[in-house]
């Protein structure tokens, strides 16, 4: 995850026709700070609901959103300007 980005793609996409619910367990490391959490995303054609439950050592300056285009839901991120990029490690669970 690059520093100081707005709505940049994480590379994670979901076909709205076949995937309805997703849980993403993740870890973010940015500089000397770390964050561990779970994203829960409910997907419906052109709509979604997202929650982000996490703990972090200090503010990592990362937030998530979902966008829709052509039947695909895309997980995106925004980062603040801390001067450091962040690593994003994740495990995806599809719940249909």
Go through each PLM region and give its residues.
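Surface-exposed ligand/attachment interfaces on beta-rich extracellular proteins
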Residues: 1-21, 30-33, 58-60, 80-84
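Intrinsic-disorder/low-complexity regions
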Residues: 3, 51-52, 89
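Subunit-assembly interface segments of extracellular/virion macromolecular structures
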Residues: 15-43, 47, 87, 94-96
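Terminal beta-strand-rich extracellular "head" domains
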Residues: 40-61
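Low-complexity intrinsically disordered segments
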Residues: 55-96
């Amino acid at each position: 995850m690059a520093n100081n980005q707005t709505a940049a793609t994480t590379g994670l996409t979901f076909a709205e026709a076949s995937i309805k619910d997703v849980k993403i367990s993740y870890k973010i490391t940015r500089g000397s700070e770390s964050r561990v959490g779970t994203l829960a995303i409910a997907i419906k054609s052109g709509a979604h609901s997202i929650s982000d439950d996490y703990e972090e050592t200090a503010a990592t300056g990362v937030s998530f959103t979902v966008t829709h285009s052509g039947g695909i839901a895309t997980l995106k991120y925004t980062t603040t300007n801390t001067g450091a990029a962040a690593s994003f490690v994740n495990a995806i669970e599809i719940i249909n």
